[in-house]
């Protein structure tokens, strides 16, 4: 089902983005309203403590984007989200406190159409709160511009290939990536080359995401741990929030290293950090794709993989929720092909099976 949010997206591009905050805590509503109001691109047009009040305000105020708490009295956030996504969809950012239960619920919210998920800022974060709120503002602003229409029709059948065991696939994504990855990962065959994923996501939520994908996919899926081997048939998801995921080769095998470091392109884990390490560790035997997301994270790393002789792809604008990261890759000529989301798994598998390699780029000219 295509979702008609063209008018809201156009209005958001033209002026200030209208935000409705839905949370049962008055203190959280006030803190979010104050924080979001510091961004000149955003206008908080209303707040609501529950689903019924939010529904009335959505009808009256026509917000461009909703921030939604999942744990609310009477009607919970997930049930409310599903109800309005069916009848009058609005781009939505889930802002949730992390528990194991809330992590699973957040994944169901993403499947129901939420654009992004943010860990609820701690009101006791002190001096770190302004930086946290800058990230929240940027992601709320980007969410209002996301395309909510999923790809039509069934995704392609898996491609049987004779890919070698030491080949590595890699995917990077941000806004809209949960839905994109949930769609394409199930179509990689069970014994596909090892597959590495960086999805921008808060600390703790990636474990729930990995469990959800493991139930959907032919390959095994789990959250990566330091020292994990990159093996055929296994998808490793970079843990959210605290460290970067890099790959090192030693003794003829590739291993995951979770390393400390400042955010790159405002992101940790960073797609660039993973891609750059892969270019050094396994460059000619890597196929990598940069999927939907805001910003530029991953573009420079994708270019490094292409220059090292690997195969590189990026998601096209029409199938991206936010055409930011793939656009940056296109502008750098980092991707040898720009593909629809549904075409990416087959092209990556065919690249792994092909005897020829993409030409290495000596320059960006």
Swiss-Prot record:
Catalytic center residues: 174, 200, 297
Location of 4-aspartylphosphate modifications: 69
GO cellular component: cytoplasm
Catalyzed chemical reaction(s): [protein]-L-glutamate 5-O-methyl ester + H2O = L-glutamyl-[protein] + methanol + H(+); L-glutaminyl-[protein] + H2O = L-glutamyl-[protein] + NH4(+)
EC number: 3.1.1.61, 3.5.1.44
All residue ranges annotated as the CheB-type methylesterase domain in the record: 162-355
Pfam annotation, one family: Response_reg
NCBIfam families: PRK00742.1 (NF001965)
Function, as annotated: Involved in chemotaxis. Part of a chemotaxis signal transduction system that modulates chemotaxis in response to various stimuli. Catalyzes the demethylation of specific methylglutamate residues introduced into the chemoreceptors (methyl-accepting chemotaxis proteins or MCP) by CheR. Also mediates the irreversible deamidation of specific glutamine residues to glutamic acid.
Family membership: Belongs to the CheB family.
UniProt name for this protein: Protein-glutamate methylesterase/protein-glutamine glutaminase 2
Originating species: Cereibacter sphaeroides (strain ATCC 17023 / DSM 158 / JCM 6121 / CCUG 31486 / LMG 2827 / NBRC 12203 / NCIMB 8253 / ATH 2.4.1.) (Rhodobacter sphaeroides)
Lineage of producing organism: Bacteria, Pseudomonadati, Pseudomonadota, Alphaproteobacteria, Rhodobacterales
